[in-house]
């Protein structure tokens, strides 16, 4: 069945699973326990099952923990390689195109975004191998360009997986927008964006944990855009110690 969604808004159960203070307290406790286990070399799948069963978490809550939680040493190592906005002037930025755009689209759609233990902003969208533009796509692209324009980057290289459906159309749309606004964007269709981003020494923009762990330097572009351009975004912060009770 074709994907006919016009938005990447919240899952019907998200208000109950992430919206109440008591639920957030439980999730933060669970996140802390999962980080503790990962830091002691527990297998990620086994650790998530153990924590999820203990706290009786819904599958979507477990998915959130899997994306947002890392072993403390891993999270710290990622933070140490993060670059501030001020360091971008005159540099080239390599952007994980679908990864960053979809997070901005989710935020604009009122969907849930997560801030993890490594400080990175992520979404819970399930877009694997297929992509279609939604109502918020033009606004998301404009927000991306509006944020990047004053940073005086030498170039912004946006990598899109060629095998993903509609990648070519999105690339054309981004190129046209960049030409209209004289943005220094180079939009590239490649066999694997992950492979390119894992190998470069340039500053990368992604929330993919595997890429972050190999990146020499990285910038949380989606988080910066959402913070500046989407102040109403629904962000659940799991990078907060659970309150004492």
Residue spans of the language-model regions?
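Charge-biased, low-complexity intrinsically disordered regions
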Residues: 1-93, 100-245
